[in-house]
Design a protein with these regions (language model features):
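A contiguous strand-loop segment
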Residues: 30-154, 175-304, 309-318
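Charged low-complexity "KEKE/polyampholyte" interaction tracts
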Residues: 384-390, 396-548
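Surface-exposed, proline-enriched loop/turn segments that connect beta strands in immunoglobulin-like
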Residues: 556-561
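A short beta-strand segment in extracellular, disulfide-stabilized domains
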Residues: 568-578
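Solvent-exposed loop segments of extracellular immunoglobulin-like
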Residues: 578-594
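Surface-exposed, flexible coil segments in extracellular/virion-facing regions
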Residues: 595-616
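C-terminal low-complexity, Ser/Thr- and acidic/Pro-rich disordered "stalk" regions positioned immediately N-terminal
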Residues: 645-686
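C-terminal membrane-anchoring or membrane-association module
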Residues: 698-714
């Protein structure tokens, strides 16, 4: 969290307690969450935080390429080299993603090392993820014996340093600890350091003391900038806890060490403040309520006449949630406003500060999947600007080597014209140049937050629909990613992120245009309704089509070969679907039938563009057909070949009755409908043939005689 310089310096003076309690909300306003894999419906771990500073503060998402012997320099105290932290790493850094400040905000645009400022969240090519930092605090007793160090490492460089050098989460913990041992800490923070096997919460406790604890699979955690959330841990078990050498001996030697009843050092109560302020306390109560593990008024906390939580009783870093979270619930946790309890609901009480507030600059959640290789185990979900009215974008950030520049301008070239410390509706109504997604969601948030009564509900509902579509389709893309050979995964990661960015931008840009038109019209008598939102059915009128870019149609019923008589009907058909989790994508499939020519090549048949095709049967012979099925995204699947064989139709003589045929040897018409007589065929010279002939002659003579008699009678 970007903390104003005056506030950081106040942490080192005697006015700390009074200042923090009276400090304006932006000074301490980040919230960190952790959900162990046994407390989720997916079996995945979720961890991350939101970064709070001001309503219209520019952040950029991008990829830092490796650097030889990188220099880490801080302008946190002043834009003069040497006044802050500076360190040169000997070696080549790892590639990593970042969510970085515009260096112009720090007068660092002309200093290559210092320009990599406040990178906050990312994953490196080794699969190590960092979310940094959650600003915390220390108490006056600790300040007196181990004050913070101006030239120590602080939030300005923490994420860049860790992502540049860490080969694993534990390696990151150890390397950061060594830096603090040597250079000290510029501020008090908690930092998430995770990989595909473990997640650590690293705490900068004071000038030179630190501790890192490994998070369990059965717990959750919410921390809104509170240094004193307690966590009992065996300090001698290095599989669960790493720490500075003097983390116990220093406070013990000065008689400020706090212990549990059994004598175990209570590190966080020893170092943290007793009360971090009502804004922090209220957000902790909101977070616990969100996860179904609500704190009890009077028992666990007290409130003032405005409903703000003024103090916490025995607050803990971890707890057992009352619900199991899915991906959507994990993402939305950083937008919580106390909706689960009217007494904590910031939508009902403007005096309450909320986790989901109008000063968030970006939010990140890392979804970590056990059992997968480090290159694809972690999905970084990133929401630009305030996440209350935003959509998180997923990326395989360990693999990512590029981002679409239209949507994510480089951190050192982005136009900062549209930003500001205060929210500005007039600025949000101005159409911006380019397609910067940060500015699109910044303006959406400004308009929705400041017109909550008429716009907030339907905008949030519509964005939730889009978010759920992205989540469902990410599962589809993930199946493809896991099946993709390792050497081809980076290409898919880059294309997938570009595709989801484009799809979300198109939806968000259209939404913003409609919101601006609504506000400019000045008529709020009816609630704003996004044109793409089907409120009755709780869906969008046209879906996000992220996974569609990678899922070809699946042919479920192949065309079958047919044999028929000349002139008869020969019908071919195909059935197909698109397994992309997109409603209505099957209805957008198109078809084209082809016939094989004498040269062996297939050519398209004019007008044969349906799932069924009736082949021509005017000529005797065989022809081979196939069909191409194309998705709305242009991906094609080709069917098996099917052969239509046309045979010569049976020839009937004039006057011949149905069911009769002519005996080739005797020219005698026989009734084939009657049952054949048992025995051999008649042969020339057989008595049966003579008998038949005589009977025939006799019959003819009899008829002629009858005719003559009839004539005479006349």
């Amino acid at each position: 969290m970007r903390l104003p310089a005056f506030a950081k310096k106040a942490f080192r003076g005697g006015i700390v307690a009074a200042l923090v309690l009276a400090m304006p909300a932006p000074a301490l306003a980040c919230t960190q969450v952790y959900i162990g894999k046994n407390q989720t419906t997916t079996g995945d771990t979720y961890v991350g935080r939101d970064e709070d500073y001001s309503p219209r503060y520019c952040k950029t998402f991008g990829v830092q390429q490796p650097i030889d012997n990188p220099v880490f320099r801080s302008f946190e105290n002043d834009s003069v080299p040497g006044t802050g932290f500076e360190y040169t790493y000997q070696g080549r850094s790892y590639r990593y993603t970042y969510v970085r400040d515009n260096p112009g905000a720090w007068n660092a645009q002309d200093d290559e090392a210092a320009s990599r400022v406040y990178s906050e969240a990312g994953t490196n090519e080794r699969g190590v993820s960092v979310s940094a930092t959650l600003t915390t605090d220390y108490n006056d007793g600790i300040d007196a014996i181990d004050p913070l160090v101006d030239t120590g490492i602080g939030e300005y460089n923490l994420a860049d340093y860790l992502l540049s050098v860490s080969s694993s989460a534990r390696d990151g913990v150890e390397k950061l600890g060594a830096i603090i041992d040597q250079y000290g800490s510029q501020d008090c923070n908690q930092i998430v350091i995770a990989d595909n096997t473990e997640t650590w919460i690293f705490a900068q406790l004071s000038g030179h003391q630190w501790i890192a604890v490994k998070m369990g699979d059965d717990v959750a955690s919410v921390n809104p900038n509170i240094g004193g959330l307690q966590y009992k841990v065996n300090l001698d078990d290095e599989s669960q806890c790493l720490h500075s050498a003097d983390v116990v001996t220093l406070p013990k030697s000065k008689d400020v060490l706090v212990t549990y009843d059994d004598g175990t050092p209570n590190i966080f109560k020893t170092y943290g403040k007793e009360n971090s302020g009502s804004s922090q306390n209220t957000r902790l109560a909101q977070g616990r309520a969100y996860f179904g593990a609500a704190l009890a008024p009077q028992t666990d906390y007290t409130v003032d006449e405005q409903g703000r939580v003024t103090s916490l009783i025995d607050p803990q870093l971890t707890f057992t949630p009352g619900i199991k979270s899915d991906t959507f619930a994990a993402l939305r946790s950083l937008a919580a406003r106390g909706e689960q309890d009217d007494s904590l609901n910031a939508n009902l009480n403007s005096a309450l500060y909320a986790i989901g507030n109008n000063r968030t600059t970006e939010s990140n959640i890392f979804q970590i999947r056990s059992g997968l290789s480090s290159d694809i185990a972690t999905i970084q979900w990133e929401a630009l600007s305030r996440c209350e009215f935003s959509v998180y974008l997923p990326s395989y950030s360990a693999l990512l080597t590029e981002v679409p520049a239209d949507y994510f301008p480089a951190w050192n070239t982005v136009d900062g014209t549209y930003t500001g410390r205060k929210d500005d509706v007039a600025q949000a109504l101005v159409e911006k140049d380019g397609k910067n997604l940060d500015y699109v969601f910044m303006d959406i948030n400004t308009l929705a937050y400041n017109n909550r009564a008429s716009m907030g509900e339907n905008v949030r509902a519509y964005l939730d629909v889009l978010q759920k579509q992205v989540i469902a389709q990410q599962d589809v893309v993930d199946g493809l990613m896991q099946a993709t050979p390792a050497d081809q995964r980076t290409d898919l990661a880059n294309k997938a992120f570009a595709a989801v960015s484009e799809q979300v931008y198109n939806k968000a840009a259209k939404l913003l245009d409609e919101m601006r038109a609504y506000v400019n019209a000045g008529d709020t008598s009816s609630a704003f309704m996004p044109s793409d939102y089907d409120a009755e059915n709780g869906t969008s009128r046209t879906p996000i089509m992220y996974a569609s870019a990678f899922v070809a149609p699946s042919i479920t019923a192949q065309p079958q070969s047919v044999t028929c008589a000349q002139g008869a009907e020969a019908k071919l058909s195909v059935a197909a679907t698109v397994d992309d989790s997109v409603d209505g994508s099957d209805a957008q499939l198109t078809y084209q039938w082809f016939v094989k020519g004498e040269d062996g090549n297939f050519s398209a048949i004019d007008g044969a563009t349906a799932a069924e095709y009736v082949a021509a049967t005017t000529e005797v012979g065989s022809k081979v057909y196939r069909v191409e099925v194309t998705s709305a995204a242009g991906l094609v699947s080709t069917s098996d070949e099917a052969t239509v064989t046309v045979t010569q139709a049976a020839q009937e003589e004039p006057g011949q009755k149905p069911g009769q045929k002519t005996d080739v040897k005797t020219d005698v018409k026989t009734d084939t409908a009657k049952k054949a007589t048992k025995g051999g065929l008649a042969k020339t010279g057989d008595s049966s043939v003579v008998t038949v002939a005589l009977l025939t002659v006799a019959g003819v003579l009899a008829v002629m005689g009858a005719v003559l008699i009839r004539k005479r009678a006349n």
